[in-house]
């Protein structure tokens, strides 16, 4: 490999989650070039020494991912149930080693499932079909949002995708205040993982992140709705469409679900009473 190519590779590795590889363009199959590609690695969540789940994810913000996954899957009730966390390399990927309280670990062992995930898959490894759409405590109606504030947020969603800007290969999830300001966001090759990262961070931000809604760059699947509801999110905006099961779960748990969010337009699937225009 040429020295200039090697230097470019060294530079790009400063951006977590991106790697440069050789590839060929359709108009020039004789001469390879370097381009940025998003990294996807197996990430195992290990609770008190026992591996619970393996997900394919971007290798960044994994502490937030582990916290958000633990909350959105009902493994913990609050961040206080986790006593410690370390991200360590393993032979085939990364491990997030999590120390749970004894009470929460006993609960986890009682319902433990073996799950080997595809990219951001939230269903793989569910033992029974009845486990899909598990009951979620109905949400209160404490949040409101003016749809006129949505356009500005949509324009800035890409700001939270530095890997996506280079590779075109990530989803984003961001927290949107009632003013339309995006105060924080995360990206990942898996849309569910991006959401878990955001939910994990939100759980640590306190009151400043309690008022508002989630905005995601992807479609809204039932897992996205269920994870949001499990973490007390009342309004979920998605850039793409929603599935029928997502709508059913949102209706049942009192979540306001909005899809096809583009400048000047939005489709409200459930509970429009939280919204104004």
UniProtKB/Swiss-Prot annotation:
SUPFAM superfamilies: Cytidine deaminase-like. Its main location: cytoplasm. Keywords: Cytoplasm, Molybdenum cofactor biosynthesis. The active site is at residue 121. It is found in: Cytoplasm. The keyword Cytoplasm applies. The keyword Cytoplasm applies. Required for formate dehydrogenase (FDH) activity. Acts as a sulfur carrier protein that transfers sulfur from IscS to the molybdenum cofactor prior to its insertion into FDH. Belongs to the FdhD family. This is Sulfur carrier protein FdhD. The lineage of its organism: Bacteria, Pseudomonadati, Pseudomonadota, Gammaproteobacteria, Enterobacterales. The gene is fdhD.
